[in-house]
Amino acid sequence: MTNIRKSHPLIKIINHSFIDLPTPSNISSWWNFGSLLGMCLILQIITGLFLAMHYTSDTTTAFSSVAHICRDVNYGWIIRYLHANGASMFFICLFIHVGRGLYYGSYTFLETWNIGIILLFTVMATAFMGYVLPWGQMSFWGATVITNLLSAIPYIGTNLVEWIWGGFSVDKATLTRFFAFHFILPFIITALVIVHLLFLHETGSNNPSGVSSDMDKIPFHPYYTTKDILGFLVLILMLLILVLFSPELLGDPDNYTPANPLSTPPHIKPEWYFLFAYAILRSIPNKLGGVLALILSILILAIIPMLHTSKQRSMMFRPLSQCVFWLLVADLLTLTWIGGQPVEHPFIIIGQLASILYFSLILVFMPLASAIENNFLKW
């Protein structure tokens, strides 16, 4: 009798994806973040589902329903903070996952990379809409400012914004539709994740050296399942430390004030994981230019495979490209810091320089470093 995991039509798919999957023997801990993202997604869907059971998407009761969850629902506070801080963990894993793809040249798997970019956009949209739901001051004004950016689109901009709002300002209709989208998008993300994995398993995983590992593969289980479980435990530990000791560390105090359309907070800013893009948006004085720069700051990932001029795939043996990569990481951290600062001297000029450097590093210095390295190696 054949083994059920190899013969059953459904279990067979799981077997080929997570058990008997041939995996390079040398992939490092940077490859753990894909599975950690899967765990974050499952955690967000479960906690979100329980929150949705008690949340009401009406402007008059949304804020108090979140307070009710924290005060009156059994373990509601921990579910709420797991969901809020789970989003931060999700984005930390996302940024590291994308960074690893950049460093080790995983972007040469075009289909996987492009689905990943779509996933990044979808997750960012979901997180933005989730931030609006508690209906605090920063929720309301964040929604107003970000949706208003669409009015920069020539000719149809104003109509588009009012269509998204469902009225002439951010109101009940906006909150209801944001809740509906925030609820459905994670399931769309799950479907996209399956497609992402499908494309990945067509080619097999990349590895740190960037060369073909066909001659040196090992089964995913037990080697990498064990390694992934260790990653899960570390991430859960970090999340629980954050949730149980300082759940408000990454939040905004303004969001504990109910939304008031008549009072603007002194500094409107999004959650920390959007600050780098927000800093790029603010660094351009022109509204349309800022919006385009904001979109391009993420969309630029799509042209990275075209800018790959090196004869080697990975940056593992390319010291010059490594310097450019870590400069880019430092620049993104600078942009994140600037995004949270008020619009005044010296932050304006620092933001503008960091924004120019961000695009220059990707569009000019990365291909240039690769070309110089090729020249050194007489390739």
Swiss-Prot record:
Protein name per UniProt: Cytochrome b
Record SUPFAM superfamilies: a domain/subunit of cytochrome bc1 complex (Ubiquinol-cytochrome c reductase), Transmembrane di-heme cytochromes
A biological process from GO: mitochondrial electron transport, ubiquinol to cytochrome c
Further facts: Heme 1 (or BL or b562) is low-potential and absorbs at about 562 nm, and heme 2 (or BH or b566) is high-potential and absorbs at about 566 nm.
Record text on subunit structure and interactions: The cytochrome bc1 complex contains 11 subunits: 3 respiratory subunits (MT-CYB, CYC1 and UQCRFS1), 2 core proteins (UQCRC1 and UQCRC2) and 6 low-molecular weight proteins (UQCRH/QCR6, UQCRB/QCR7, UQCRQ/QCR8, UQCR10/QCR9, UQCR11/QCR10 and a cleavage product of UQCRFS1). This cytochrome bc1 complex then forms a dimer.
Organism classification: Eukaryota, Metazoa, Chordata, Craniata, Vertebrata
Residues where a ubiquinone binds: 201
Binding site for heme b b566: 97, 196
Positions annotated to bind heme b b562: 83, 182
Record-annotated membrane-spanning stretches: 33-53, 77-98, 113-133, 178-198, 226-246, 288-308, 320-340, 347-367
Native species: Tapirus terrestris (Lowland tapir)
